[in-house]
């Protein structure tokens, strides 16, 4: 699916090229901030072949990050569980 098709058919538009966080990705990603108010919500779109580096999201309370995958496949690691 092209970016144009994604932006036309999905409620989760790709947004602008994610240059601010580019050091954490191999390849091109796009960021569309859906909310910046009380709970920041961002939609990150990975171009074909893009991946991000293993990392952790910590939070003082609640969850550090919640992932909602809309297409494709990926890997994640749960704390305390075998990879």
Where are these regions (language model features)?
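Intrinsically disordered, low-complexity regions
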Residues: 16, 28, 43, 63-64, ...
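Short glycine/serine/threonine-biased micro-segments
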Residues: 25, 47, 70-72
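Ligand-binding pocket scaffold of soluble enzyme catalytic domains
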Residues: 44, 48-50
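A short beta-strand-loop-beta hairpin characteristic of the jelly-roll/cupin
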Residues: 51-83
């Amino acid at each position: 699916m092209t970016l144009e098709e994604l932006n036309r058919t999905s409620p989760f538009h790709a947004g602008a090229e994610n240059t601010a966080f580019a050091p954490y990705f191999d390849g091109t990603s796009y960021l569309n901030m859906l909310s910046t108010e009380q709970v920041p919500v961002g939609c990150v779109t990975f171009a074909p072949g893009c991946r991000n580096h293993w990392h952790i999201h910590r939070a003082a309370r609640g969850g550090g990050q919640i992932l909602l995958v809309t297409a494709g496949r990926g890997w994640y690691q749960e704390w305390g569980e075998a990879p």
